[in-house]
Amino acid sequence: MKLFTHYIFNKKNTVLASMLLIGCSTVPRLGVWNDFKDELALKTQYLVEKDADKNQALQDTINFLLAEELTVDAAIQIAVLNNPGLQAVFEELGIAQADWLQAGLLTNPKLKAQVLSGGGEVKTELGIEQDFMGFLLRPLRVKLGEAQYQAVKHRVEHEVFSLIADVRESYYTLQGDKQLLTLLQSVVEASEAAKELAQRQYNAGNISVLDLSRHQANYHEVKLALIQNEIQVEIEQDVLNRKMGFTSAQSWKIKGTLPQFSEDEPVLLELVSRATENRMDLQALKVEIKVLEE
């Protein structure tokens, strides 16, 4: 059952009724996306933007990064701008914002008018009928909508940080395997030279067939390892390519050697504590639990 408030106006305050009608029919939009992307840029140190595929300036930036020797930061920046999965997640933020704004809207009041005549006089009355229960629940709906938006916001942040971590892991894995590939190529060359030398020594009668077989087996073993590593590098290149948002092969190249380990790496327990405090998915769950408690 709905409760309604009924306001009666005479000719003198008809203007007031019109103002009330206008005020109830519109809700100002909130520019939350710009605030969100600026906040996320500070946290991640990467440019965050949606619909980058429709922004020529951002596409030029991506092409410029691809033309240079690809660093881990460049790969992450491309992924944040170009990954279609992340772009879809950004749309969830827009939906949550729309739900939040919708929660603040009141049903449009009903305008009633009547003309009374009697005793030679004509009397005009204007009335506005408003859903009173909806009016009372509006603050609660707005608060709930904001809390749900904050939960979605934390989940979106979690997706951004997860993508950054995934791209960084893929980049360093590829970089390490490419470095191993270079090493295996040198080993294969050395093993092939040793095999050819052993063949000449065997032909001259200086070594046994068993020694020759050992050299041949060693060559084929390292050759197989090289082929397997080449396949693995191609797979990892494709994985990183897709994480950066590309569906077809791109002619990018990464740096060849892994960075040196820092001597000032934080201890594991400190990393675990920091991760627990800052994980965005946990922050989203905390917001949802708080809403349920209230």
Regions found by a protein language model. Name each.
Residues A57-E68, P109-L137, R141-L144, I254-L268:
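Small/polar, glycine/serine/threonine/aspartate-rich low-complexity segments that form flexible
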Residues H154, H158-R274:
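Periplasmic alpha-helical coiled-coil/stalk elements that build and connect Gram-negative outer-membrane
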Residues A96, N108-G118, E169, G176:
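Short, glycine/charge-rich beta-strand/loop segments that flank catalytic centers
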Residues I76, K112, E125-G127, Y171, ...:
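Membrane-embedded beta-strand positions in outer-membrane beta-barrel channels/transporters
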Residues E288-V291:
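Long hydrophobic segments that form regular secondary structure
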